[in-house]
């Protein structure tokens, strides 16, 4: 069974980036407990790229069904509405990638 990499991208106007970044930082407290308890979670990252005025949530799951739990995770849905109300746009659909290969650091470096 191959793991799934889920990627969600938010874009905003450059003058709203700082506010959106702070909202994303604050979102961790709301989202972390529920996400950590989800079946199949392997890793979760929130990130920001000021150069493109974008924020991302990238996660790795054991399978597609596990990744799709995020589609109905109410705290995430609610926060998405808050971001949208502040002018954010989301790339849709959210992408769920079946992994083709992976790399890990070599233990012999």
Name these PLM-found stretches:
Residues 1-56, 62-75, 85-109:
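Short S/T/G/P-rich N-terminal loop/turn motif that feeds into the first structured element of a domain
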Residues 77-81:
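A common structural junction motif
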């Amino acid at each position: 069974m191959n793991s799934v990499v889920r990627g969600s991208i938010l874009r905003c106007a450059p003058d709203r980036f700082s506010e959106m970044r702070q909202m994303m930082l604050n979102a961790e407290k709301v989202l972390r407990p529920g996400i950590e308890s989800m079946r199949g979670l392997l890793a979760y990252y929130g990130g920001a790229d000021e150069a493109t005025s974008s924020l991302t949530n990238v996660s790795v799951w054991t399978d597609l069904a596990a990744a799709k739990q995020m589609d109905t995770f109410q705290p995430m849905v609610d926060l998405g509405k808050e971001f949208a109300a502040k002018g954010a746009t989301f790339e849709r659909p959210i992408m769920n990638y079946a992994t083709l290969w992976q790399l890990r650091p070599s233990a012999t470096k």
